[in-house]
Amino acid sequence: MKQFILENICMSDMSAPSVCSTDRFPTFESAMEEAHKQFKEEAKTYRKSYGADNITTEECYRDLYIKGPDFIDWWTAVEVTTAEEED
């Protein structure tokens, strides 16, 4: 059985990259649906805090980025092998 982990990674000028959350999903599509939901919510928050002109966003196949003057907030979906697949 395939599973996907949605990772949210935050990086800033003041700290090393850290994984903010890891959630498991049964399909790539469900992981990316949640990624887009979180991405849109956080983009609104960052635009209010930093100003819309200071925030850029990028969307790739399995990666979503919010970039600010001193940070990057990144979501990625990663396929993982479950114990059932290893047997």
Feature-to-residue mapping (PLM):
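Short aromatic-glycine-(Arg/Gly/Cys) micro-motifs in beta-strand/loop hairpins
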Residues: 1-21
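Generic detector of N-terminal low-structure segments
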Residues: 6, 27-30, 41, 73
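Serine/threonine-rich, low-complexity intrinsically disordered segments
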Residues: 7, 11, 24, 29, ...
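Short, flexible coil/linker segments at or flanking structured domains
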Residues: 10-16, 27, 52-54, 68
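A short, exposed loop/beta-hairpin motif centered on an aromatic-Gly-Thr core
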Residues: 16-33
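Short, mixed-charge low-complexity intrinsically disordered segments
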Residues: 37-87
